[in-house]
């Protein structure tokens, strides 16, 4: 018995439709629980084949586990559902898609890629163009994370072509957003060498400029659709991209829009990111007092959200901003706060940067004994980190193991794009 033949194809549509690429880089959109309840009720009252019911119920339980954030358990249920088997290819396609999404959340990207490929092949076999579009989007996002940008672009193009052919404006907007994310990630990967914003290789500029074009195209559609949350996400990524390109005034405009939309929805986390990003842009525009005000608002929101890592980042940024203004005593106050939080978080890289900054500030004030004290602490931490990096590099198959350790610092330099919870760029003065 095919479940999608009953209840106006309720079961397969309920499983398939929500697995769309939403306007974020987190590729899973979980199933609507009211629809799941209807599916469960349908299964309960329908006398179907035992195989179909068991497979579906295992898949539903897997979805429920993912809903509460237990993706490992979700994977177990989905894989059990596949082992039980189903004759309904659309249900199988949905399970493949959910498995790919669950593995994506677990950061097991090779497995995610495997199941999204299965889903893509199955949707093509079924002649399900809408499913193929969504599978292409999921596959593209996974390839992007793996750094396989050219392949990701092909998937995004297929996603866009299908949705355009179906006059699906929502799907087109998502495909364009994904396009922008791929080119943004490609550009960032090329210039990820500690270079100043704007001072990046030409190849990176080309990719980032393409990203801005796709984000602008996406904005034109989501504005027509009246989708304010999608507009907010795109403005955030557009601002991040302009920042990397050195277009700081444009970054301010984009992040200003992001801030307005975040306030509109009471999204304090997005509001905090927007304030931080605005502070970063104003630093490069030379408007240090304005930057400081935005960082202070970032700090206030971080404290409200009880996010100690972001609180540390904000203190570090404020310390550096006051150093630029030559207000060294205020800079010391903020760097001390950064140091205390870094110690609480056991963040040795953050501690080292705080000590370095404190040493510089005390030197500027002529407090030579304190400057020496913090310089010595910085030296001890630096040696410790270098030893760790040596062993990490020696025993790791990755050549960038040392870099990964340094960039994992809670309260030091942290960059993530809007679709992965936004940008916490810090202005590092060393």
Residue ranges and their predicted role:
Residues 30-47, 72-83, 118-121, 217-220:
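Repeat-mediated protein-protein interaction surfaces in helical alpha-solenoids
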Residues 49-50, 87, 127, 167, ...:
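Structural signature of alpha-solenoid helical repeat scaffolds
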Residues 54-83, 101-107, 188, 199-202:
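Alpha-helical segment of the N-proximal tetratricopeptide repeat
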Residues 56-67, 91-105, 131-145, 171-185, ...:
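Conserved alpha-helical positions within TPR/SEL1-like repeat arrays
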Residues 65, 83-85, 103, 123, ...:
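Eukaryotic all-alpha helical interaction scaffolds
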């Amino acid at each position: 018995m095919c479940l999608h033949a009953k209840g106006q194809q309720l079961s397969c549509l309920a499983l398939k439709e929500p697995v769309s690429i939403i306007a974020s880089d987190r590729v899973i959109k979980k199933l609507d629980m009211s629809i799941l309840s209807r599916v469960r009720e349908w299964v309960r009252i329908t006398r179907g084949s035992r195989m179909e019911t068991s497979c579906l119920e295992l898949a539903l339980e897997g979805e429920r586990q993912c809903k509460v954030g237990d993706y490992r358990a979700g994977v177990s249920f989905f894989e059990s559902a596949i082992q039980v088997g189903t004759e309904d290819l659309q249900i199988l396609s949905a399970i493949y898609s959910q498995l790919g999404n669950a593995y994506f959340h677990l950061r097991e990207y090779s497995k995610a890629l495997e199941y999204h490929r299965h889903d893509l092949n199955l949707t093509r076999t079924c002649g399900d163009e809408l499913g193929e579009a969504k599978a292409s989007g999921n596959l593209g996002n996974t390839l992007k994370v793996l750094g396989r940008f050219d392949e990701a672009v092909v998937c995004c193009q297929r996603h866009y072509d299908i949705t355009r052919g179906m006059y699906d404006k929502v799907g087109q907007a998502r495909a364009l957003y994904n396009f922008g994310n791929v080119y943004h990630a490609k550009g960032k990967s090329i210039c990820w060498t500690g270079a100043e914003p704007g001072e990046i290789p030409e190849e990176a500029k080309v990719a980032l400029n393409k990203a801005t074009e796709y984000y602008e195209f996406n904005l034109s559609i989501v504005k027509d659709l009246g989708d304010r949350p999608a507009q907010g996400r795109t403005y955030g990524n557009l601002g991040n991209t302009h920042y990397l390109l050195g277009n700081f005034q444009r970054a301010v405009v984009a992040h200003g829009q992001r801030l307005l939309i975040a306030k509109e929805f009471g999204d304090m986390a997005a509001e905090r990111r927007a304030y931080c990003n605005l502070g970063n842009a104003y630093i490069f525009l030379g408007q240090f007092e304005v930057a400081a005000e935005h960082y202070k608002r970032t700090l206030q929101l971080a404290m409200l959200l009880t996010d100690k890592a972001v609180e540390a980042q904000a203190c570090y940024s404020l310390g550096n901003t006051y150093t630029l203004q030559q207000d060294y005593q205020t800079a010391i106050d903020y760097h001390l706060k950064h140091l205390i939080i870094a110690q609480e978080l056991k963040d040795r890289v953050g501690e080292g940067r705080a000590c370095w900054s404190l040493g510089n500030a005390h030197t500027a004030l002529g407090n030579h004994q304190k400057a020496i004290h913090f310089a010595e602490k910085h030296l001890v931490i630096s040696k410790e980190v270098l030893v760790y990096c040596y062993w990490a590099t020696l025993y790791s198959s990755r050549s960038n193991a040392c870099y990964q350790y340094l960039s994992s610092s809670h309260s030091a330099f942290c960059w993530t794009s809007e679709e992965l919870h936004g940008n916490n760029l810090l202005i590092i003065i060393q």
